[in-house]
């Protein structure tokens, strides 16, 4: 579908959308075009009733509210672009409204659970296995910095300042920021760079910081698997992936007294409202502790 390839280029070059967002949008639009074909319609016959029918089909199949909201965002971006290109006479999605997604409190680790997970990863790396050294760095760096897993996998060696314990991150919308990390993450980084990465590096590795078993840049899906498997080692810890470590890092920073705007900068949130979600997590955890510990709770 050449038109989707052109739209993908538009999203990447003119809108600065991340690869993750573009992949999700294109998947939604392929679904829409398949729906159109099933009705015997062409793209220039796309209308508001057709869009509503497509969304209703997804809702009937059990699509989550957040999925429907993303589908609407995808189609609104696409139809506005297609109208601008002259491929649509009017924008049929202009009147579609994105439903407000429910904001749920994310699952987070207790601080003692986070320490147990880091200890388990360190223990696994003590034999010097290259993949175990890498896996320790993955969980340490995600928890230490709160960066996204896509940002972690996109790091090059030169993005890490080992002397000052800083990492330069290219985030959403191609916005660059710097995140500090502590001594444990620095120790994991040193072990990986000295003993792990050299054992896996190939001509295909390039400048990538993290590598897969075949020497290529580590894939996001592989990193997710590593986190899930490492967290599962700790009894009682909630099942979570990289985003759970990001949630936990933010919550623990706030519990430790960090300023909300500092946390916003560290996480790369464009809106303070997004960061404020973590204050609700911290307060709810405070309430649990208070209820359990205070004699007059």
Swiss-Prot record:
Annotated GO MF terms: DNA binding; tyrosine-based site-specific recombinase activity
GO biological process terms held by the UniProt record: cell division; chromosome segregation; DNA transposition
Alphabetized UniProt keyword annotations: Cell cycle, Cell division, Chromosome partition, Cytoplasm, DNA integration, DNA recombination, DNA-binding
Core-binding (CB) domain ranges (all copies): 1-83
Assigned GO CC terms: cytoplasm
Primary subcellular site in the record, as a coarse category: cytoplasm
Cross-referenced Gene3D superfamilies: 1.10.150.130, Intergrase catalytic core (1.10.443.10)
Residues forming the catalytic site: 148, 172, 243, 246, 269, 278
Location relative to the cell: Cytoplasm
Coiled coil location: none
Domain Tyr recombinase: 104-291
PANTHER family: PHAGE INTEGRASE-RELATED, TYROSINE RECOMBINASE XERC
Family designation: Belongs to the 'phage' integrase family. XerC subfamily.
Subunit structure comment from the entry: Forms a cyclic heterotetrameric complex composed of two molecules of XerC and two molecules of XerD.
Function: Site-specific tyrosine recombinase, which acts by catalyzing the cutting and rejoining of the recombining DNA molecules. The XerC-XerD complex is essential to convert dimers of the bacterial chromosome into monomers to permit their segregation at cell division. It also contributes to the segregational stability of plasmids.
Entry-linked HAMAP family: Recomb_XerC_XerD
Name assigned to this protein: Tyrosine recombinase XerC
